[in-house]
A protein has these predicted regions:
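Amphipathic, small/basic residue-rich leader segments at the start of a protein or domain
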Residues: 11-164, 171, 176-195, 207, ...
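A short core secondary-structure module
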Residues: 226-282
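Flexible, small-/acidic-enriched active-site or ligand-binding loops
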Residues: 280-306
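A glycine-rich, basic-preceded beta-loop-alpha segment at the flavin cofactor/substrate interface
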Residues: 299-334, 351-368, 515-536, 548-568
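Terminal amphipathic helices with adjacent charged low-complexity linkers/tails
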Residues: 359-375, 595-602
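C-terminal helix-coil-helix/basic helical segment that borders enzyme active sites and/or dimer interfaces
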Residues: 385-414, 427-430, 434-435, 564, ...
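Glycine-rich phosphate/cofactor-binding loops in nucleotide/flavin-utilizing enzymes
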Residues: 434-534
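C-terminal amphipathic alpha-helical interaction region
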Residues: 505-611
Length: 611
């Protein structure tokens, strides 16, 4: 009896401790907050900007273990407007007819002048620019469709159109430019009078773009015959697409103000500027040769080039805001450009390999009937279906107003990796026809070019090991970012209040996720159903995905609890957790594609294979 009484007293004391806020904060939350601050890894402003950039979307539901199938199924199938469809049927087809990949890469080392003139005059370089400035103002889905189609014909053509419509001068001007900058540059970009390039990567800071050594010093100098407050900028950039032919160079560098001409801050931070190609001291024109693919790509340099502060995108007030600008704009471009281009390459490979396997006979039998080839064809078909599902849903998220940084990283990594596998399998099927380069070899050049997409916009090895879970955990978790912000709050009292609210919400969330994961595991997902949402034939897959999401949410929390700040250095573990989150998203894309395309019976096997 005394034991029961003692237990009741302990439970009552715990209840009082947890429910009486002042007592809980002083005896529990404050010591936990102290330990949390000690375990929290140091974070630079550039890291913080990268983590806080963009938005979270469906991937957050998956991370939290409670996918909102009603919300996902409510997303309408992306549709092209009449203008967009006409552009795809006419201008895009004509552009494809004008470019011969073999001629570009082995004879002329450039696209024909007629093709350059055509894509400029027909608005290919201004698809993201609003009509008010003379652009096309296409949807993200239309943009994706155009890039995917061009990629099936010519990589130099697709890249030359893709880059001006991705992260670069137009995108940055739209969001941060002054009215004067917008009114002058955007119409010229839309008409193709300006060819843009954006110089970020340096020889010594590739994927770690925040560490760029290029710098500018605020000073006074002569500009148009008058002494002007400006900056002397020194840069050495490489791998810049369109740099050899650009007329408007976007430039990222770290700006310093040692003499305090703009205020007391000496290190203003990364800054973005627009520099005309003929500005004194700008060096462009030399070219790289990326995997024998002759799109325009090359270095650019400048040594103490003086330019007025008005060259800064957004004017002098945006000095030092460049990293935030880049991170906030990166999500949209990364969700469209490389996923679309590589989905297009996979479509090309699937068509070539599938057709070849039907007509190529070995031992008086079409090779498509050999089990070894069937296995490759199945993987080609499945990955191509999956890639297009990811491409479409990623573009749809942009059209819904999202800027999903984690989704864009997932799409870039997994679409490019699967396109690489599709091309490898296709080359195995066509054999010698793919090895010997020539005008009739459709796959050889595409296979040779694959490392380009794997490497650019965040190398895949970096993306998988550091970004997918590292960024996803903080952005998608309902409480972790709030806890971090509370721990760093300058007002200690307010920080304690905020942390108390976030931490105990986190505890309830973890317990609920763990209980749900165990329950769904014990019942084999029988009660994890999505209700009446989704196709009947896919309900079991949706139940399994609900179960997996709950288990992942619980596992992610336990991992972060056990490792704390050291998780940042556990790259292989982070990569595996990122794989789980990414595959949950990929499965969702497949289910959404199958549902929104009308639940085509012939596609059910493809969808099940992907799942």
């Amino acid at each position: 009896m005394s034991f029961i009484l003692m237990m009741l007293i302990i439970l009552a004391a715990c209840a009082v401790l947890l429910t009486v806020a002042p007592l809980r904060k002083r005896l529990l939350t404050a010591p936990i907050l102290k330990g949390f601050r000690a375990a929290l890894p140091s974070m630079s402003e550039t890291e913080r900007a990268a983590l806080e950039a963009g938005t979270v979307w469906w991937e957050a539901d998956l991370f939290r273990g409670r996918p909102d199938w009603r919300g996902l199924t409510a997303i309408a199938r992306p549709q092209l407007t009449a203008e967009e469809q006409s552009f795809l049927d006419h201008e895009v087809e004509e552009a494809c007819r004008m470019v011969n990949e073999w001629q570009v890469n082995f004879k002329d080392y450039d696209m024909p002048k007629a093709a350059w003139d055509f894509i400029k005059q027909k608005g290919f370089l201004g698809m993201i620019i609003p009509k008010a400035y003379g652009g096309k103002q296409f949807s993200a889905y239309a943009h994706s469709q155009v890039v995917a189609k061009l990629s099936t014909r010519s990589s130099p053509l697709a890249i030359s159109v893709m880059v001006p419509n991705s992260l670069g001068p137009a995108e940055l001007l739209l969001h941060y430019g002054t009215e004067e900058q917008k009114n002058y540059f955007l119409p010229r970009l839309a008409r193709g009078e300006e060819i843009p390039a954006f110089a970020l990567t340096s020889p010594w800071a590739g994927s770690d773009a925040a560490a760029i050594p290029d710098f500018g010093i605020v000073c006074k100098g002569l500009w148009q015959g008058k002494e002007t407050l400006g900056m002397r900028v020194t840069w050495n950039k490489r791998y810049i697409t369109l740099a050899p032919v650009c007329t408007l160079l976007g430039l990222a560098f770290r700006l310093y103000d040692p003499d305090g001409l703009l205020g007391s801050t000496k290190d203003l931070g990364i800054t973005c500027a627009l520099v005309p190609h003929n500005h004194p001291g700008v060096d462009i024109g030399r070219r790289h040769i990326p995997m024998n693919t002759y799109f325009m790509n090359g270095p650019t340099q400048g040594d103490q080039v003086f330019m007025p502060l008005e060259f800064i995108i957004g004017g002098p007030k945006m000095a030092g805001q460049g990293w935030r600008m880049l991170m906030e704009c990166l999500s949209a471009g990364r969700a469209i450009s490389l996923p679309s281009a590589n989905a297009g390459l996979a479509q090309l490979a699937a068509r070539v390999a599938g057709g070849y396997a039907r007509i190529r006979n070995q031992f008086k039998t079409p090779i498509s009937r050999f089990e070894g080839i069937e296995e490759l064809l199945a993987r080609i078909a499945g990955y191509t279906y999956l890639n297009d599902a990811v491409r479409t849903l990623s573009a749809a998220s942009i059209d819904l107003g999202q800027r999903p940084s984690v989704v864009s990283a997932i799409a870039k990594y997994h679409v490019t990796e699967r396109a690489r596998q599709v091309l490898a399998d296709s080359m195995d099927i066509v054999g010698g026809k793919g090895i010997c380069l020539g005008p009739s070899n459709i796959l050889g050049l595409a296979y040779q070019q694959m490392p380009i997409g794997i490497t650019v916009e965040g190398a895949n090895v970096l993306t998988r090991n550091l970004i997918l879970f590292g960024q996803g955990a903080i952005r998608c978790h309902p409480y972790l970012l709030k806890e971090m912000q509370a721990a760093q709050h300058p007002d200690r009292g307010q920080g304690l209040n905020d942390f108390d609210h976030a931490f105990w919400g986190h505890v309830r969330y973890t317990i609920a996720n763990g209980a749900r994961a165990i329950w769904h595991g014990l019942t084999a997902s029988a009660f994890a159903g999505p209700g009446s949402q989704g196709p009947v034939e896919m309900r079991q897959a949706m139940r399994d995905l609900n179960r997996s999401a709950a288990a992942f949410g619980f596992l992610a929390d336990i991992t972060m609890l056990m490792l704390g700040g050291s998780l940042k250095r556990k790259e292989r573990l982070s990569a595996r957790l990122g794989d789980i989150l990414a595959h949950l998203f990929l499965a969702s894309c497949v289910l959404k594609r199958y549902e929104m395309e009308g639940r085509i019976r012939e596609d059910a096997d493809l969808a099940h294979w992907c799942l």
